[in-house]
Amino acid sequence: MRPLRIGVSTYSFWHFKGEPVDIAHCIDRAAEMGFDGVEILHQQMGGEDNAYLQDLKRRAFTQGLDLMGFSTHQGFVSPDKAVRQKNIDHTLRCIDIAWRLGIPTLRVNTGRWNTIKSFDELMANKGIEPRLEGYADDEGFKWIIDSLEQCIPRARECGVTMGLENHWGLGRTAEGVMRIVDAIDSPWLRVTLDTGNFLEDMYEQMQRLAPHAVLVQAKTYFGGGEWYSLEIDYDRVNKILRDAKFRGYVSLEFEGKEDAATGVPKSLAVLRHTLAG
């Protein structure tokens, strides 16, 4: 079996601190470091106009890189229908952007209750937060399912598969992610598996999601993690992915405090070694 292809998220070069690192610069660095592709973080982009998008696509192509993932944020867990509609509209726009960039998959999130406002505090609490008073998780799941169902026709039209990530909120666990994916039951909504977002029973939960994954995000923490560090056995992750017959891209999300100039190449070396076959 061929080695898995390895890309890098532009998030690896910018952890939401200071001015966003230019996407074009990230593409150039990815090529220099020897990656196969690039996953673009939407919040890091310098614009959405077509000239900007096509320049990024041209740049990646001339560097021999695939633009293989588009990482976006959603917040469907709200009793306010207007808030949910705003997030639906945002997702539809992001599907269009991915299509214009030639990117085949879009990372989507469930959103969360937002009863803990600070992300740092949320991470200190292991991603767990109280429900909004007067509401139950069942209602939150219904909002997410109803919202993502409205995005399926656009995803199908554009040929962009949404990948629901295990990314806090009601998608914090494999059970929560699969509750949504199974309910919608569409080939245009699958899973983005993040190896660093399961803080309990990580390998068992990865096994649950791996057969449904269209993209895997691989966390590393050289220099210590920005919020926490996990000891992830990537030989074991590789076996999970192989057993699930996963053949897609693995996207590095370097989340360590070490400078990206050294932390990212170190991470690539680990992934090249462990995911070789």
PLM-predicted stretches and their roles:
Residues 75-80, 114-117, 200, 222-226:
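A short acidic, helix-capping loop that chelates divalent metal ions and anchors anionic groups
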Residues 36-45:
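A short beta-strand-loop structural module common to alpha/beta enzyme folds
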Residues 1-34, 102-105, 145, 149, ...:
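Histidine-acidic metal/acid-base catalytic patches
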Residues 54, 59-66, 78-190:
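Active-site acidic/histidine proton-transfer and metal-coordination neighborhood
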Residues 39, 69-71, 107, 163, ...:
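Conserved beta-strand positions in the central sheet of alpha/beta enzyme cores
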Residues 20-24, 44-53, 85-86:
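Aromatic- and glycine-enriched glycan-recognition loops and surfaces
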